[in-house]
């Protein structure tokens, strides 16, 4: 594509409005238009960066990363994406948090969400656990938002779970 307007024109032809304020759990839950929009936006961001056009959509904010398994590519890709959009990354180390002392998923999820715009989770160690855990986190922050505890509900991005790895599809 030659210019940014071409990406905008392409996006205007796609139906991806349901993704707004939504989470990204599983690749196969997305429509063809939604997946095409993800790739088109990625291409547009790449174009903007290559042409020295700011990609920052946040003046400040946090991207929380939670890696329950070792990671190199996914960890640095998430950090790079957050930085590209204007977010600071804070890694949640469960061993150094109150989770280690029995704090519940609901308590932890709501606490880290006070200033978070996005939460990226990689939990792929045990079959039947990772995706379920991600849904538990989203359910907790959704309820926190509905109850007025949270000013906003952060978006959850599945960085890899036991059944999908959308960031490397």
Model-derived features with residue positions:
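Phosphate/diphosphate ligand-binding glycine-rich loop within oxidoreductases
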Residues: 56-169
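Positively charged, low-complexity intrinsically disordered leader regions
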Residues: 2-76, 80
């Amino acid at each position: 594509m030659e210019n940014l307007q071409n990406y905008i024109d392409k996006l205007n032809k796609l139906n991806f409005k349901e993704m707004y304020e939504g989470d990204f759990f599983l690749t196969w839950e997305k429509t063809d238009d939604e997946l095409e929009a993800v790739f088109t936006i990625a291409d547009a961001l790449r174009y903007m960066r290559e042409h020295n056009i700011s990609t920052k959509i946040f003046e400040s904010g946090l991207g929380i990363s939670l890696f329950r398994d070792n990671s190199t590519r996914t960890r640095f890709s998430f950090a790079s994406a957050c930085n590209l959009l204007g977010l600071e990354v804070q890694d949640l180390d469960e061993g150094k948090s109150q989770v280690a002392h029995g704090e519940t998923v609901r308590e932890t999820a709501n606490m880290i969400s006070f200033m978070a715009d996005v939460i990226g989770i990689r939990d792929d160690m045990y079959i039947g656990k990772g995706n379920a855990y991600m849904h538990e986190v989203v359910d907790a922050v959704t309820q926190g938002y509905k109850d007025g505890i949270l000013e906003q509900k952060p978006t959850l991005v599945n960085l890899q779970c036991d059944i999908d790895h959308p960031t490397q599809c």
